[in-house]
Structure formats: C-alpha cells, structure tokens
Regions:
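Juxtamembrane intracellular "pre-TM" segments in multi-pass secondary transporters
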Residues: 1-5, 202-234
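Extracytoplasmic gate region of multi-pass secondary transporters
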Residues: 29-30, 227-279
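Conserved MFS/SLC helix-loop-helix module at the cytosolic interface between two early adjacent transmembrane helices
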Residues: 65-104
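Cytoplasmic membrane-interface "Motif A"-like loop-to-helix N-cap segments
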Residues: 75-87, 287-301
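Cytoplasmic helix-loop-helix junction between adjacent transmembrane helices
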Residues: 110-148
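Glycine-rich segments within core transmembrane alpha-helices of 12-TM secondary carriers
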Residues: 139-165, 363-376
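C-terminal transmembrane helical hairpin of 12-TM major facilitator-type secondary transporters
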Residues: 292-345
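A late C-terminal transmembrane helix in Major Facilitator Superfamily
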Residues: 350-385
Length: 403
C-alpha cells in the first residue's frame, strides 16, 4: 500500500538547503560586479570575455556539458548517489572559493567545480518529489524546492552588497570580498555535510502507485521528445529560463543601465522576492485545483508587463529615481510570474512524460534554458555591455511571442 512517511519533510529540507547554498555560490558576485572588478583589478581584462560576469556564465556553460550525465547518474543510481556527489563537490569547492578568495583564477576554478556539481542537484527536483511525496503534494514539493533556489539567489543579491564595499562614494569601495566569500564557503560546507548525513534514497514503500519509473534513460529521452506538450514546454523554458538566467547574471549591469550608481542589488532582489511569493502561491493552488496548464498560461502572460517595464523604464521618465522605481516594480512582477513557472513546468513535464525518468525531463528543460541564458549573457556582456539595451528589447519581444 502506498504510504507517505514523515521523513519526506527531512529529505525536502536538506534538499532545499543544498539548493540555497548552490545558488548563493552561483551569484555571489553578480550583484556587486563593479566593486568586484575593483577588488580583482589587474587580474583580468575588464573589457574581455573573461570578466566578473563570466563567473555566473560558467554555471551555464558547464551545465550544457554535465546535465545529461548528471540525469543519467540520478536515473541509474538514484537520488542519494546523484545528490551526494553534487553535495560533496559543492562543499569542497565552496570552501576553496572562500579560502582562496583573493585570487581571481582560484575563484574561477572553484566556480567550475561548483558548476559541475549543479546539475546533480537541480536535475533531481522532480525525482525527489516523486520518490518521497504522494501525487497531491508533488507540486508543493517542487515549489518549495524552487523556493529554496530563489532564497539562495535572494541572499546573494541582497546580503552580498551589505558584506562588501558597494558604494563608490564610500572609501571602502571594492573591499570585503575575502570575508564575504569565506563566510559563504563555511556555510556551504556545513550544509553539504548535513545533506550527506541525512539524505536517503526512498521510503520503505512508495508514496504513490506511479512512483516507479519504467523507461531506461535512453528510452525516456525518445519517449519525452514524442510528447507534444513536452515540446511546448521546451520552447517555453528556452525563452523563459534563458531570460531569467540572463537577468539574474547581469543584474548589476542592468542597474547601471537604469542609471543606478550604487550596486545595491535591489533589482535582482525584488525579482527574487516576487519569485518567492509566486512559488509559494501558484504551485500550491495548482495542487489544490489539480490543474497545471492554466497556471502555466497565467505565468507566461503575467511575465510580459514585467519584462516590458524592465526594458523600457527609461522611456517613461527622464528622472533617474522614477526610472529606478519602475525598474524595481517591473522586476518584482517579472519574478512573480517567470519564477513560478519553473516548479509548475517541472512537475507538469514529469506528469505528461511518465513513465520516463523525472530527472531526464527536468534536465532537458533546464538544458535549453541554460543554453539560451549562456547566449544571452554572452551577447549582453560583450564590449562592456554595449548590447545590453538591445538584448532587453529582444527579451520583451520574446515574452510577447511566448504569450
């Protein structure tokens, strides 16, 4: 008989924690890219491709290579092996990044290690929910996992500027990066240890009758690509996740484009706050009403005004404060809808592609979003962000087409 065990909440908690620190490490410098360039001055060419923004882009580059191998490990050997591999690498590389924070090269190498670990965690969201949660709770479990990712990004966006010298008008501008990265490093290491100790593969009996996959990894991919709804989901993630990855990675540059001198991280922070609220509400409603499609449509339509406001804020006023306020409000709206679509899309994809392995369908969605995110960030950051405004306009157009 299917049974839901209380230990499922322990599993979800440790999975959420490892997601939090993974996202902190991803964007630790994204909101403070300009003062970080001062801290690492002389260690890289600011006008080259290998700059501060490249640290966030590493995650996307490596994900394209490691996503399918990670999904294969999770599908073949289980979530305990897959997530444990990721957690061990996250703990070691996160701590090394903090200990060797003064060396830009060392930070880049540690970031590569963190990027290798990323798909072993991100691709396991639906696998964790299916192995441990009954069908009626899976949208909520996926939503809470996404919520943890957003909390991690929010910490990176909001807390980091307070831990370093981020105001160019202050004498300590560009300092404090060593202690900040070391603090994040020890936090990451501690969470990784807890994850390794508490993680379990599956409960003694399945939580639902459909909890066991029937397809192998290769069969699952072929089955997934035959599903029309899955092909639509791949397109939506191709656009939506790509935009989210690009905006998250370039948040400080977007703030500069809006005329904001202080690297306060609020544009990215409010997008994350909106995403946290959305991920707390819409997946729960989706579970309650047993509907996925209608809420996905709401998310796609709702992101349009947010993207337009963020792109064309400067067209509404010449006052910097007003432009910044419009950018902040638009960022919140964009985050609420675009970030709620993630957990809904993952769970919907797992359901329409059953009995294909869940981590395979999720890995494919993440893969296409990382691909476009990489392309977008590369285009936005080239020649000292020369094409940033044009890229934002393209995002606005793509959001309308998707809706």
């Amino acid at each position: 008989m299917p049974k839901a065990y209380p230990y499922r909440w322990v599993i979800l908690l440790v999975f959420m924690l490892i997601n939090v620190v993974l996202q902190i490490q991803w964007l630790a410098l994204a909101a403070v890219a300009r003062p970080a360039a001062v801290f690492y001055q002389g260690q890289f060419d600011p006008s080259s491709f290998l700059n501060i923004d490249f640290l966030a882009m590493i995650y996307m580059v490596v994900f394209l290579v490691m996503s399918f191998p990670a999904s294969y490990v999770i599908d073949t050997y289980g979530i305990r092996v897959g997530i444990s591999l990721g957690a061990a690498l996250i703990g070691v590389c996160g701590l090394l990044k903090g200990v060797l924070a003064k060396s830009f090269l060392a930070v880049v190498i540690a970031q590569v290690g963190l990027a290798v670990a990323q798909p072993f965690v991100l691709n396991a969201v639906t696998a964790v929910s299916v192995r441990w949660f009954p069908l009626r709770e899976r949208g909520t479990a996926a939503g809470l996992s996404a919520l943890a990712q957003y909390v991690g990004i929010l910490i990176a966006m909001i807390a980091t500027p307070f831990m370093v010298g981020s105001d160019p008008a202050e004498p300590g501008y560009g300092t404090g990066f060593g202690p900040m990265l070391l603090t994040y490093g020890w936090l990451t290491f501690g969470v990784a240890v807890v994850t390794l100790l508490l993680l379990r593969e599956r409960p003694p009996t399945p939580p639902s009758a459909d909890s066991r996959e029937k397809h192998s990894f290769g069969e699952g991919i072929r089955h997934i690509l035959k599903q029309r709804d899955m092909r639509i989901m791949l397109y939506l993630f191709f656009v939506g996740l790509g935009i989210f990855n690009a905006v998250s990675s370039m948040t400080d540059s977007i703030a500069a484009n809006a005329g904001v001198e202080d690297s306060d991280g609020l544009i990215g922070g409010l997008m994350l706050i909106g995403g946290i609220l959305g991920a707390s509400i819409l997946p729960v409603l989706s579970d309650r009403f047993r509907k996925r499609k209608v809420f996905l449509v709401i998310c796609v339509v709702g992101m349009v005004p947010g993207m337009f406001g963020l792109t064309y804020a400067g067209s509404f006023s010449t006052d910097v404060a007003t432009v910044y306020a419009i950018s902040l409000a638009s960022s919140f709206v964009l985050g609420f809808f675009i970030m709620s679509a993630g957990p809904l899309g993952f769970q919907y994809a797992a359901e329409v592609t059953h009995p294909a392995p869940e981590s395979t369908s999720q890995g494919m969605l993440l893969w296409v979003g990382q691909l476009t995110g990489l392309i977008f960030v590369a285009f936005m950051s080239v020649e000292s962000n020369r094409y940033l405004s044009a890229s934002l306009s393209a995002f606005a157009f793509l959001s309308v087409v998707s809706a």
